[in-house]
Every structure is written in structure tokens, then in C-alpha cells.
Amino acid sequence: MISKLTDTVTLNNGVKMPRMGLGVWQVNEGREVEASVTAALRAGYRSIDTAAAYGNETGVGRAIKQSGIPRSELFITTKLWNAHHGYDAALRAHEASLNKLGLDFVDLYLIHWPVKGKYLETWRAFETLYKEGRIRAIGVSNFHIHHLRDVLDSFPTVPAVNQIELHPLMAQKELRAFCAQHGIQVEAWSPLMQGHLDLPALAGIANKHGKSPAQVVLRWDLQSGIVTIPKSVHERRIIENADVFDFELDASDMAAINALDRGRRFGPDPDNFNF
């Protein structure tokens, strides 16, 4: 049983990644993101997921530094934005993110979106950074199967992680199976469906276990082998989201949640975005 917040999965290169972390999408730079990260670290989180596009890497880095937690105990993820695809641009973007975070390295660096015709050259830069030991693991975000095939057919380094929109209404079963087949860890962004949790099936399971629908969804992630990074700016909610290690969903619970899949996206389709 997955029993504590510091439990990890082992990525395809041997690096250990916490099964749960804090996401900071749409968390404002400055006091808000610093307070959010500080609350999470105080609550026992050791994984923080940011991105260049979020505009809050500086605040994340400041909160990490002020926490006093040894760097070796933390797992920090950031992502390369779409404007910085290409070999040289990606190298510069990586350096810029490190400078903002105030870190010597990140644990996981992701290509945020698969910009058509550009992501392969970017992956070449990622491989360079990885081989030089400047990143502990490299991965992608929002990659469909055909995007992953492009990378797998072109390069020796298999992405360690694919971070995708994934939740009970968008379970991504085919993509998850492909990732499992190739040793790519799936990570869920927007695991709580941007607040669309008012579903009778979730309410029933939550009542059964004395938990909230959000906690049920996060437990479903964990028991499905999915790394999850719920976002919140409220300390009470950050603590509540982490309170999912004292119960277990049974087979009927898991089946009921799996049956909610409708292929419903709340975010952009990686094959059809214009940013």
C-alpha cells in the first residue's frame, strides 16, 4: 500500500520521484507562490512542479532556499516554454530557469508542449544537458503517442516522464498503456479536473471512506501508478490533498472511477493549440 507522502516511483534511469507533489500553475509570482510552496514543504511535500511559462520560478526558488530543507531531499521540476524550442534556444532556456530558481540543477526538465516541427531539436538539447549531468531526468509534457514515437524513433534516451492532462473524466488509457510499455512514467496535471468534482460516483466513494471527492481522485491516481501534482494556494487544502495515505480504494471503487472516463478535456489538445 502507498502509505506516505514521501513514497517514490523509480524512473527509467533509476532516479526516484515522489508520487505526489505540489503544482504551481496559475499561482502568482511573489508572496502567493512563496506561501504555497512553503506550506507544502511544511506539510511534508518534497516535490514541486513549476514551469518557465508560469512566471513563478523565482518565488519557488526563494521558498526552497528559505525552507532550509537539504537540496538532496527535494525533487524540482520545471519546463521549457514553446518560444524556446530548438537546440541553442533550449540550452539558454534551461540556464535561465536555473538562474531564476537559484538552483544548480533541476531533477526533472520537461518539454512543455510538442510544438510541431521543433520538439526533436529540443530533445537533442535535452539529451546534451542530461549527458552532461545538468539534469537528473528529462521528459515531456502533453505528448500524444505519435509525438512519443517521433522521439523514440529518433533518439536513444527515452523520456522519463510524460506529464499530461489526466483525471477520471479523461483517463488516457491508451496513452498510459503506451507509456507503460516503454517505461515512461505518467504524471497527471490538473488531476482535480479544475474543480469539476461534483460527480455522484465520487461523492458516494468519498462518503464511504470519510474523505473528500478530491482526496478520492488523488488516491485513484496513486493506486493507478500515476504521479500527481495537485495545485492549491490554500494551506488547508494543501494539507488535505496530502491526507490520502490512510485509506485504500477497493476494486469496486476503482472500477466505478474508471467508468467515469468520457475523454473530456479541460485544457488544450496537444494536436490543436496555438500558443
Identify the meaning behind each predicted range.
Residues 2-9, 58, 62-65, 94-96, ...:
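Alpha-helical scaffolding within the catalytic cores
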Residues 45, 103-106, 135, 159:
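A structural motif
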Residues 28-41, 86-101, 148-149, 170-171:
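Short, acidic/polar
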Residues 22, 48-50, 106, 138, ...:
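Alpha-helix N-cap/helix-start motif at helix boundaries, enriched for small hydrophobics
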Residues 79, 83-123:
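Glycine/small-residue-rich loop that forms an oxyanion/phosphate-binding "nest" at active or ligand-binding sites
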Residues 12, 61-73, 95-104, 128-130, ...:
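Acidic (Asp/Glu)-rich catalytic clusters
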Residues 1-74, 273:
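N-terminal binding-site loop/beta-alpha segment at the start of enzyme catalytic domains
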Residues 29, 114-267, 271-275:
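Beta/alpha (TIM)-barrel catalytic core signal, keyed to glycine-rich beta->alpha loops juxtaposed to Asp/Glu
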